[in-house]
A protein has these predicted regions:
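Terminal-proximal interaction/regulatory segments of ATP-powered molecular machines
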Residues: 1-101, 108-140
Length: 140
């Protein structure tokens, strides 16, 4: 429930669920009824989003449908001779740019333009969506 139905609309839901499971293991029943009730109430009241689940399923489907290769500028460049293969050439390190974001191609040519993670307007995902819009609007 915490990941499948709530996801990043409330990222704390997974923390609450994990903490509740650990507490139940340590405390035992019948005292754990209150722990479980608290966690269940939190999950019931949390904003919901299945965007993260949809994203991984869409990405896995894309991998099954399309044979791709990693863009050459993203390929490993931590060995001698990588330059001859073009590996790492032209790579832009995001943390060297404003807002730690840089426009560059990350997806293989074969699936360039596909979008897997569609943020919702629910809970924290709305803030993530606004953040992504801001950094893209202000990228070099």
């Amino acid at each position: 429930l915490a990941s499948e139905d709530i996801g990043n609309a409330d990222p704390q839901a997974l923390v609450v669920a994990t903490a509740a499971a650990q507490a139940v293991e340590r405390v035992g029943m019948p005292e754990s009824q209150i722990i479980l009730s608290q966690a269940a109430a939190y999950m019931a009241c949390a904003p919901k989003s299945n965007a993260a689940g949809n994203a991984i399923f869409a990405a896995m489907d894309s991998v099954k449908r399309t044979r791709t290769t990693v863009p050459v500028h993203l390929q490993d460049a931590h060995y001698g001779g990588h330059e001859k293969l073009g590996h790492g050439i032209g790579y832009k390190y995001a943390h060297d740019y404003p807002n730690h974001y840089v426009k560059q191609q990350y997806l293989p040519d074969e699936i360039r333009g596909e979008k897997f993670y569609e943020l919702s307007d629910m809970g924290y995902e709305k803030k993530l969506k606004e953040h992504m819009k801001f950094i893209k609007d202000h990228a070099d």
